Each structure stands twice: as C-alpha cells, then as structure tokens.
Amino acid sequence: MKKTNSSPISTLKYALGPGLILAAAAIGVSHLVQSTRAGAEYGFLLVWAILLASLSKYPFLEFGPRYTIATGESVLHGYKRLGKWALWTFTTFTLLTMNVVQAAVTIVTASLAAKLTGIALTPFIWSTIILLICISILMVGKYSALDKIIKLIIVILSVSTTIAVIVAFGSSGAAIPPPVAPSIWTVGGVSFLIALMGWMPILIDASAWHSLWILERIKQTGYSPKLKESLIDFNVGYIGASVLAIAFLALGALVLYGSGENFAISGTQFTSKLISLYTSTLGNWAYWIIVVAAFTAMFSTTLTVTDAYPRTISYILNLNAAESEEPLGYKSYNSMLIIISALSLVVLYLAGSRFIFMVDLATTISFLSAPVFAFINYKLIFSGRFKQHNTPPNWLKWLSWFGLAFITSFAVLFLYWKLSFS
C-alpha cells in the first residue's frame, strides 16, 4: 500500500487516470463528427449548446467518483443497494446499445486507420483488425496498459488538435466565420441540436464505467485517493473533453463553414470529407495533423469502449453471482471482452444498409435513458449512506436539480421531434 502521508502533489499522480480514460471515451463521434459538423454548418453559433450540455450532465457524472471514493464500491453496487430495479434498468439499457455503439465507433476508427496507413482493406476487415488490437492490449496488459496508452493518446490528441486549430486560425485560407449563421430553429436544425447535445460530452451511464476504472486504479497503485484528488482527476478529464469539443467545433467553423458542402452524412463519410477539405484549404502538409488528431480521437474511444462494456457486464454478472456459491467461469472479463467484440463485428457484418437505422435506434434509447440514469445517480448520492463530509455542496445539488429538469425536458423534446418529423 502506498503511504497516504505523502505530499498532496506526490499522491495526486496515483489518483490520475480514470478521469482521463473517461475523457478518452467521450472524445469520439460526439467530438470528431458532431462538434466539427456543428462548426461546419453553424460557425461558432452552437458553442453555447456544448457548454450547456456539459454543464447539465456534470453533477451526475461527478457523482460516480464521489460515490466510489466515499463507499469503496462501484456505483453498480450502489444501484443494487437501491433495489434490483435500478441495476436491471442499467443492465437492460446497456445490453440494448453496447454492440451498436461499439460497432459505430470501430468502423469510423477503421476508416481513419485506412487513411493513416494507406492500406486499402474493406471497412469490415479494418474493423476486425482494430478490435483485435484493442482486445490484445486489454487481455495482455489489462487496466495498466489501458491507463498508460490512454494517457499517451490524450497527450497526442490534445497537441495535434491544438496545432490543427492554431493552423486553421493562422491560415490565410481559413477565414473566421461571419456572426450570421443559418437558423438552428428549423426541423433539420433542431434534430441536429438534439443529437449534438444528447451525446455531449458523454452519456450519463458512463459514470458506471468511471467508477470501475477508479477501483482498478486503486488496485493498480495500492493507493486509495482522497475525494478531492479523485475529483481533480474527474474535472481534468471532463472539462478537458468539453474544451476539446469546442476545439473540434472551431475546426469545423474555420475550415468547413461556408464551403457549400453537405455534411448530413455518415460518420465515416464525414471524417473523409473533413480530412479532404482541411488538406485542400491549408495545403497537403496539413494532412498528417488532421489525420493524427482524428485517428487518436476515435481510437481512444474504441479502446475505452472495448474495455468498458466487458468490464461492466462481467462486474454485473459477478455481482449477482456473489449471491450463489459458485460464480460461473464465463463471467470473467476476458470472456466478455471476446464475446461482446465478436457480437459487435456480427452487427457490422449483418446490418449492411440497416446499420444507420440501428445507430439511430441506439441513439434514441440512449437519449431516453438519460433522465432515468440522472435520477438514479441523484438518488444514489442522496440516499443517506454518505457521511457529511462526502455530501455534495449545495451548489452541486442545485445544479443537479437544473440538470435533471433540463435532461428530462430534452428527452421529451427528442421524443416529440422523432414522432412528429420522422
């Protein structure tokens, strides 16, 4: 066990990691595709939407590390303590969406891998290769490898994205968009706004992933961080992910806005168009800047998602099996890692032209589940199991009330829009 009487700075390094992995999970399609498209179509008009979405979800994701540090157990264990209804609600939503989500982020990563390497393979073969790489990393290196690789990727991603934005600002070929942009208050505009804010910066159920990563980090280092240290880690990751979302919006605004192109296309098509227009606007020398930024954004998401779902499902299975005398062997993390990834590849292979519909369905389920998980996390934190010094401050409680009202209204608006204009 690491000693806890060391200086705050020396012990903080042991707490850092889970929040960065959460950020890596967040910085994927929502950033590379949705944020960049927001800038491409509306200039800087939708910065407020990113900030508002991030603010409204903040309390419910912050409750993840707060609960885990205060109790020493994951929020999934907390859901079970609230009642089996909470745990099985989470499990049901996860099972309905996990393979489609993993398949969606993997195929976008696959298209970028083809551009990065110049090796022309089918999207399915590249997707298989990407997932095999992720599985190998996680099976051999486990959480320790995930922690180290994500920290490296986050550095590369942050540097490459910052350079890409600075180059776009400084280029004579990239003009700052005029203040007047197309109205967002149209059928198509509101539909896009819902998609942008719904995934920004990450879904609330990711608080369960974060909780499990904290427990793994404690096992890895032998150090149990103080609440303040764990919240610093969370804030670095969460706020950093929100800042990078604005950076990708700036890329779209500076490079793609006013190009006259149609950006209402799939994620793989959008990333190809982004790279093409970025290069044609700034010059061929800028190709590697945008490709590296895009690939690291998507690979980090694919790697973290490939870890998150098996870790979550295996934990839930073993949590329930703890009631029996002999937990089954197939409930192990490695088994789930292979099974879930294989099923995601099956989804990719069989879906074909129906894949976009499946992604849309998963998106709908995720949006409608957001207020449910916000309520569960709120109830978990204010259930009376907390000691006074771990209870959230009043401002966070008030923010959670606002967030719950906003997220619920947002889900109702999303459902209304789907039923009225689909």
Predicted segments with their positions:
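Juxtamembrane transmembrane-helix boundary signature
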Residues: 22, 49-80, 89-101
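Hydrophobic transmembrane alpha-helices that form the core helical bundles
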Residues: 87-118, 127, 298-317, 354-355, ...
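Membrane-water interface regions at transmembrane-helix termini and the short interhelical loops
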Residues: 108-116, 131-153, 347-357
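Hydrophobic alpha-helical segments and their helix-loop junctions in multi-pass secondary transporters
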Residues: 155-183, 193-212, 374-386, 410-422
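Loop-to-transmembrane helix boundary motifs in multi-pass membrane proteins
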Residues: 123-130, 236, 240, 317-350
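Extracellular/periplasmic helix-exit of transmembrane alpha-helices
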Residues: 58-68, 214-215, 221, 239-272
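Flexible loop linkers connecting adjacent transmembrane helices
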Residues: 2, 35-39, 61-85, 113, ...
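Membrane-interface loop-to-helix entry segments
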Residues: 138-169, 184-187, 360-370, 396, ...
